[in-house]
Amino acid sequence: MRRLEGSMVAIVTPMKDGAVDLRALRELTEWQLAEGTDGIVPCGTTGEGVTLTPAERADVIRTVIETVRGRALVIAGAGSNATHEAIESVKLAKSLGADAALVVTPYYNKPTQEGLFRHYQAIWEATRFPVVAYNVPSRTSVDLLPETVARLAKAGAIAGIKEATANMDRQVQLVEKVGKDAIAYLSGDDFTVLPYIACGGHGVISVIANVAPRAMKELVVAARSGDLAGALAKQAAMAELNRMMFVETNPGPVKAAVALLGRAGGELRLPLAPVSEASLAKVREAMVRFGLKLA
């Protein structure tokens, strides 16, 4: 298995007139590779994976894999709050040639820690495919605790975790209980890339990399190489742009930002609605101040 590390983008899913725009997706993927991105993560939260049909998810993952052609990692979004559906999604990612699957903790039904353990264990037993568990309690209302991550790692059921709690004590606990390099530790929070890596993280699955991929890659390289001053300066420079990517619910602002770059339309799928004019103005202003060239 390839090492799951570096600067990865939670890539948006371009849409046009209600349909997935695969041509624009290919162009976005090629641009990401040209900018130095280490991994493409389609069909995640930012990629609106939960509102894509099964056929659309297959088309998106296949398009990314065929475009990448082994030049970067592909970690395919494959989560569900039904274990049997998650298993089928991971099998799809495996059959299409992804390097790993990103599997969010089951949302809405709020399983216990034992339920979470059995969920990921069942996926592993049914697929024998590398899974990155995705812990984002703010969206799922369930928290995958370090003790459960340690159980899963010991059982070989997960290859990594995307941790989106923005809690550095949590990351310290993970390294302590699981082991520094036992699994891949990936930040799911662009605001904390530097401290996360300093606490043993291996990289990030990033939202802002959709509009500033080279800047995120440079931040990750600086942080992983121990260039604290350089990494801190890069993290600080991104702060306002990071905030504006969440001025409304993700992926609304980042899709609007991608559209402002002229790289794809900003269309969203319901129940997500376009960002307000006031929010769009804030996004545009932050992009200009960061030095991005708008279309």
Curated annotation (Swiss-Prot):
It is found in: Cytoplasm. Pathway: Amino-acid biosynthesis; L-lysine biosynthesis via DAP pathway; (S)-tetrahydrodipicolinate from L-aspartate: step 3/4. Transmembrane segments: none annotated. The keyword Cytoplasm applies. SMART domains: DHDPS. InterPro entries: Aldolase_TIM (IPR013785), DapA (IPR005263), DapA-like (IPR002220), Schiff_base-form_aldolases_AS (IPR020625), Schiff_base-form_aldolases_CS (IPR020624). It holds the Pfam family DHDPS. One of its GO terms (cellular component) is cytosol. Keywords: Amino-acid biosynthesis, Cytoplasm, Diaminopimelate biosynthesis, Lyase, Lysine biosynthesis, Schiff base. It is an enzyme of class 4 (lyase). It catalyses: L-aspartate 4-semialdehyde + pyruvate = (2S,4S)-4-hydroxy-2,3,4,5-tetrahydrodipicolinate + H2O + H(+). GO terms for biological process: diaminopimelate biosynthetic process; lysine biosynthetic process via diaminopimelate. PROSITE patterns: DHDPS_1, DHDPS_2. It comes from the Bacteria. Its EC number is 4.3.3.7. The active site is at Y134 (proton donor/acceptor), K162 (schiff-base intermediate with substrate). Pyruvate binds at T46, I205. Its main location: cytoplasm. GO terms for molecular function: 4-hydroxy-tetrahydrodipicolinate synthase activity. CDD domains: DHDPS. The record marks T45, Y108 as: Part of a proton relay during catalysis. Catalyzes the condensation of (S)-aspartate-beta-semialdehyde [(S)-ASA] and pyruvate to 4-hydroxy-tetrahydrodipicolinate (HTPA). Homotetramer; dimer of dimers. Belongs to the DapA family. This is 4-hydroxy-tetrahydrodipicolinate synthase. It comes from Anaeromyxobacter dehalogenans (strain 2CP-C).
